[in-house]
Curated annotation (Swiss-Prot):
Official protein name in the record: Gamma-glutamyl phosphate reductase
GO molecular function: glutamate-5-semialdehyde dehydrogenase activity; NADP binding
Pathway note: Amino-acid biosynthesis; L-proline biosynthesis; L-glutamate 5-semialdehyde from L-glutamate: step 2/2
Task of the protein: Catalyzes the NADPH-dependent reduction of L-glutamate 5-phosphate into L-glutamate 5-semialdehyde and phosphate. The product spontaneously undergoes cyclization to form 1-pyrroline-5-carboxylate.
EC number(s) stated in the UniProt entry for this protein: 1.2.1.41
InterPro entries: Ald_DH/histidinol_DH, Ald_DH_C, Ald_DH_N, Aldehyde_DH_dom, G-glutamylP_reductase_CS, Glu-5-SA_DH, GPR_dom
Record's subcellular location: Cytoplasm
Reaction equation(s) it catalyzes: L-glutamate 5-semialdehyde + phosphate + NADP(+) = L-glutamyl 5-phosphate + NADPH + H(+)
Record's keyword terms, sorted: Amino-acid biosynthesis, Cytoplasm, NADP, Oxidoreductase, Proline biosynthesis
GO BP annotations, alphabetical order: L-proline biosynthetic process
Record-linked HAMAP family: ProA
Entry-linked Pfam families: Aldedh
Protein family (similarity comment): Belongs to the gamma-glutamyl phosphate reductase family.
Length: 416
């Protein structure tokens, strides 16, 4: 089954690579319209998925990731329309020039070909990935989690209907709807057909893909994100940033999980933090210093060492007091996932040092980690957030779904 999907996807990719920007935008507009027109069928499938997931004991954080609402689906359709408005990178000449040999050389951006994506309980990924791949002339094979198989199937049917209406092969966007896990291992070895693989899920999925895939893999999306409250931080805006980074949508990978507090500000900062977190419903997981300093009003529990390496994806926040900037940077290097980290400070020398020494895909000064997102970065919907350094890093927009080819123009030109 998968080989036939691969053959069809590869054939579709050749056709997609030749489309003009106008032709690609036309199909994206059609997809957005169909998502809204077929909203009832998609939401009905999603309700079944959510009910099944709840019966299977999925956490509230996972249920939030899984659930679609009319507003969320409308936002997804609007994201597709925003992709239409983005500049098409395909065909762009990156650089080049006339060589001494007389050969005119240029480096031109081209589609990757076929992209494979394996993801878990995130139904929005189906549309986000499909829209970005189509905009860049790539075919895509999707393998969503069993928790979302009804939603994904309904969504892909809508996308394929739009493709067909625009005279494009339905195989440009395909989904593996069989929940058999052995198919994941089979997909990981489809290097004959798939040019790049992107896993979006937990650490176990990323480890499996890194170890078993014969396809180049882009990993990321696991966000043990930190905020360091420096000794010179302005407390009022710092609290506002922390509340946003923790509570706006706790189930996302760019949510802060560990707060590092400089010891020189801890005595003044921790009590007001506790009050603010109590109002926001956040449970604090405190180290020994925090446990001794606070006795309410926020719910406070002792921090377990292993929690420093985990994504809570919930209204829980580690709070650790550090001696200085060195301690904060060392902690992030040991426990971070190179996703998103921030410093809150009034000292621009310290800000510059933090930016230079923290090796993460996104580093912020006096801003929330929640900005690490393709839409927020002006990239449109993202295919993933890469925490590695090759071939892409951070939110992966359109350019991350392209490669380049060298093109030489001559006039009977030969090498001397």
């Amino acid at each position: 089954m998968l080989e036939q999907m691969g053959i069809a996807a590869k054939a579709a990719s050749y056709k997609l690579a030749l489309l003009s920007s106008c032709e690609k935008n036309r199909v994206l507009e059609k997809i957005a319209d169909e998502l809204e027109a077929q909203m009832e069928s998609i939401l009905s499938a999603n309700v079944q998925d959510v009910e099944q997931a709840r019966a299977n004991g999925l956490s509230e954080a996972m249920l939030d990731r899984l659930a679609l609402t009319p507003a969320r689906l409308k936002a997804i359709a609007d994201d597709v329309r925003q992709v239409c408005n983005l500049a098409d990178p395909v065909g762009q000449v990156i650089d080049g020039g006339l060589l001494d040999s007389g050969l005119r050389l240029e480096r031109r951006r081209v589609p990757l070909g076929v992209v494979g994506v394996i993801y878990e309980a995130r139904p929005n990924v189906t549309v986000d990935v499909a829209s970005l791949c189509l905009k860049t002339g790539n075919a895509v094979i999707l393998r969503g989690g069993k928790e979302t198989h009804r939603t994904n199937a309904a969504t892909v049917r809508v996308i394929q209907k739009a493709l067909k209406a625009c005279g494009l092969p339905e195989a440009a966007v395909q989904a593996i709807d069989n929940p058999d896990r052995s198919l994941v291992n089979e997909m990981l070895r489809m290097d004959k057909y798939i040019d790049m693989l992107i896993p979006r899920g937990g650490a176990g999925l990323h480890k499996l893909c890194r170890e078993q895939s014969t396809i180049p893999v882009i990993t990321g999306g696991i966000g043990v994100c930190h905020i360091f409250v420096d000794s010179s931080a302005d407390i009022a805006p710092a609290l506002k940033i922390i509340v946003n980074a923790k509570t706006q949508r706790p189930s996302t990978c760019n949510t802060v999980e560990t707060l590092l507090v400089h010891q020189d500000i801890a005595e003044r900062f921790l009590p007001v933090l506790s009050k603010q977190m109590a109002e926001s419903g956040v449970t604090l997981h405190g180290d020994e210093t925090v446990m001794q300093a606070l006795h309410g009003p926020a719910k406070l529990v002792p921090l377990k060492p292993e929690e420093l390496d985990n994504e809570f994806l919930s209204l829980d926040l580690n709070v650790v007091v550090v001696e200085n900037m060195d301690g904060a940077i060392a902690h992030i290097r040991e426990h971070g996932t190179q996703h998103s980290d921030a410093i809150l400070t009034s000292d621009m020398h310290n800000a510059a040092r933090f930016v230079n020494e923290v090796d993460s895909a996104a580093v912020y000064v006096n801003a929330s980690t929640r900005f690490t997102d393709g839409g927020q970065f002006g990239l449109g919907a993202e295919v993933a957030v890469s925490t590695q350094k090759l071939h892409a890093r951070g939110p992966m927009g359109l350019e991350a779904l392209t490669t380049y080819k060298w093109i030489g123009f001559g006039d009977g030109t030969i090498r001397a």
